[in-house]
Regions:
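Short beta-strand elements of extracellular/lumenal beta-sandwich folds
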Residues: 27-39, 185-198, 285-286, 290-305, ...
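C-terminal soluble interaction/assembly domains
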Residues: 356-440
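Beta-strand-rich interaction surfaces with strong enrichment in secreted/lumenal proteins
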Residues: 28-32, 80-82, 150-151, 177-179, ...
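Solvent-exposed beta-strand/loop surfaces of large extracellular or lumenal domains
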Residues: 19-22, 58-83, 131-139, 212, ...
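Low-complexity, acidic Ser/Thr/Pro/Gly-rich terminal tails and inter-domain linkers that flank the onset
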Residues: 18, 166-184, 341-369
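Short acidic, flexible loop segments centered on an aromatic residue
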Residues: 18, 47, 55-61, 166, ...
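Intrinsically disordered, low-complexity Ser/Thr/Pro/Gly-rich interaction regions
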Residues: 207-211, 227-365, 390-394
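Post-signal-peptide, soluble extracytosolic/periplasmic N-terminal scaffold domains
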Residues: 9-188
Length: 440
């Protein structure tokens, strides 16, 4: 006799989802572990379970239970598997016309079946118009992924066990929706988390945690590969109930109520209440990204006085703006994990009325290990009503460098980047010119 431990018998289920196609599952069961109920079979585990990560321990005091052997069985029932196991065994086939053909299955390859019948060898086209009957399920095939343990020790009729494991096929990311107000001076922000479960198991009434941060993982091949199936999407519109806290060098978001995470489902839950954040629309020119275009970005500080001040997990930030009676999509960008008091820059798109052109107008050798360049950047504003300031981002890779002169103020951002702020009048043009000395 074996004991089947299914999801319905779960005392508690804990699910932790990472940003890296990884989930941590912990389930507590009260099971009969006495010798007459062994081996112990534990079903409804994730199909993409990582076997080497499985950990079984007893929570019952005084128990002497020990694990001698562990097996992860994932040879699941399918028509292909059944026929594969029935090679050299008798089968019965009913054709489209109702004819019964009995014989020994010799081969099932591609779109054909080869049978040895009393009349000889028969080759039949394999399609959905055939009905194939077999006596029983072949040994070794199972209906659900299963963990099987061989145990030592006396055990108990009611022993509380904790099973934990890692699984591939689980992911989450944040999704942000921002509605621009007052010409970009503020943004109404909604934040969601999207949990994508394709691990091959459903977790009922689970205690959910999300880990924001990059966990280092060793390069190890997955134990099981699965085809992606059709997915459903569930959206939870209730008030946000995530508690956020620091954990090691990461951030954890814990849902304060149980939730069911179905297999092949994307679940969306509000991350925090809607907020209005002070923001600024800025224009940037970076010739290394696009030599002709000027980008428009929405910039805000992730701080309390701006209306936010919360750790922002990595995700896609989508922006909308009102046009008369409707909202229109104006652009999206990917943001990285962003801590409190850090600046967020969202590239919305290219400014239609702004253009730029960069030229090296002079270049001379100063010494055998240095040279001087004069660079000119022309910025054009074709909007007849709006003055703008364009931030010019210049990337410099020439060892030791020095800006000898510039007709606009600049800030050295780091060892390889400098920024110039250039005001451009409506329907006007401005030229940035600076001299660069490079040494190597």
């Amino acid at each position: 006799l074996t004991l089947l431990a299914g999801t319905a018998l779960a005392d508690e289920t804990y699910v932790t989802v990472y940003n890296q196609d990884l989930g941590m599952i912990k389930q507590v069961r009260t099971l009969n572990t006495r010798p007459d109920n062994r081996p112990l079979r534990f079903t409804d585990v994730a199909a993409q379970l990582i076997p080497a990560s499985v950990h079984l321990r007893t929570l019952t005091g005084g128990s002497n239970l020990q694990v001698l052997e562990q097996n992860f069985e994932f040879d699941l029932v399918s028509s292909e598997k059944i026929l594969e196991k029935y090679v050299d065994h008798p089968v019965e086939i009913v054709t489209e016309g109702g004819e019964l053909v009995s014989g020994t299955l010799l081969s099932r390859k591609g779109n054909s079946l080869v049978l040895k019948t009393a009349a000889g060898i028969k080759i039949m086209a394999f399609n959905d118009k055939l009905s194939i009957q077999v006596k029983e399920l072949p040994q070794g095939l199972i209906t659900r992924p299963t963990l099987i343990w061989e145990l030592a020790g006396q055990g108990a009729a009611e022993e509380k066990l904790e099973v934990s494991y890692l699984t591939a096929g689980m992911n989450w990311q944040a999704a942000y929706v921002g509605i621009l107000e007052d010409e970009g001076k503020s943004v109404d922000l909604k934040a969601w988390v999207s949990i994508d479960n394709r691990c091959g198991a459903t977790f009922e009434n689970a205690h959910l945690k999300l880990v924001a941060g990059e966990v280092h993982r060793a390069a190890e091949p997955r134990a099981v590969q699965r085809m992606l199936k059709a997915e459903t999407m569930a959206e939870e519109k209730a008030a946000p109930q995530f508690e956020e806290r620091r954990f090691f060098e990461y951030h954890i978001y814990q849902l304060e109520r149980p939730t069911t995470i179905k297999d092949n489902q994307i679940k969306q839950i509000a991350l925090f209440p809607d907020v209005t954040v002070k923001s600024e629309k800025k224009f940037f020119y970076n010739a290394s990204r696009d030599p002709k275009k000027v980008e428009v970005r929405l910039v805000f500080k992730n701080e309390e006085k701006a209306g936010l001040g919360k750790p922002l997990p990595a995700g896609i930030f989508r922006l909308y703006q009102k046009d008369q009676k409707s909202l229109e999509f104006i652009g999206e960008d990917q943001i990285e994990h962003t801590g409190r008091n850090e600046e967020v820059k969202i590239t919305v798109g290219n400014a239609f009325d702004l253009a730029a052109e960069r030229k090296v107008i002079e270049q001379s050798k100063v010494t055998s290990r240095s040279q001087r360049q004069t660079i000119e950047i022309e910025l054009r504003n074709n909007n007849p009503k709006q003055d703008v300031t364009i931030v010019v981002e210049e990337s410099i890779y020439c060892g030791d460098w020095q800006i000898e002169s510039s007709n606009f103020t600049y800030v050295k951002k780091d060892i390889n980047q400098v920024e110039f702020s250039v005001p451009v009048k409506a329907d006007g043009t401005a030229k940035l010119r600076y001299s660069l000395l490079c040494r190597w």
